[in-house]
Amino acid sequence: FIKADVAAPGVDIFSASVGQGTEGVYNTGTSMAAPHVSGIAAQVMQAHPDYTPAMVKAAIMNSADTDLTNNAGSKYAVDRMGSGFVNAKKAVNAKVLVYDEENPERVSLSFGVLEYPLDGEDHTVTRNIVVRNMDSVAHTYELSYQYGPEIPGSSPEVPPLVTVEPGETVKVPITFSTYTPFLEKTIDPTLEKEQTAMAYVNGQYQPI
């Protein structure tokens, strides 16, 4: 399945620290990002006390901003940013939730590992996502699929539109087709093809 779920502020974050008295400390990492997400989850729970943990997670993931790029303008792939960069206001105001039908607690849909022979045939698999409208008005969405990065030999298909009436839950089929002779591994454009491994030693990062 897909991880991470979301991206959050986690670089050079000033926070409280054990043993610092009234002072704080700057840190970087998931230890700084996780409290941001926890705070947003608390806000969603306060606004929607009837939401289950899976619904709170869906509200945060569905509302995340997807236009997250590096300094060169290349967009991060889903395995680096999840569903996007957390947006507290949008998460609190989320009244339409989208999640995987088979694994609603995961929210994101994954086709898993697809293993096919090199037989020159098309192979197709379909999974459903659920769109649940808890608003008092109907919502219509245009659907599309955005690669990150593009995978030669594959072809996703989604319906062009979906409409959910107030209080309605709709299943939307997501189809993924592969043509094995053309399949090719591609690299996230935000990553370098050659990278240096680093180790954290005595408070500093050092190349291995």
Sequence positions of predicted segments:
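Short, small-residue alpha-helix embedded
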Residues: 33-49
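Buried hydrophobic-core signal for structured, non-transmembrane domains
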Residues: 6, 82, 124-133, 174, ...
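Beta-sheet-dominated interaction scaffolds and their linkers
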Residues: 88-134, 158-164, 191-202
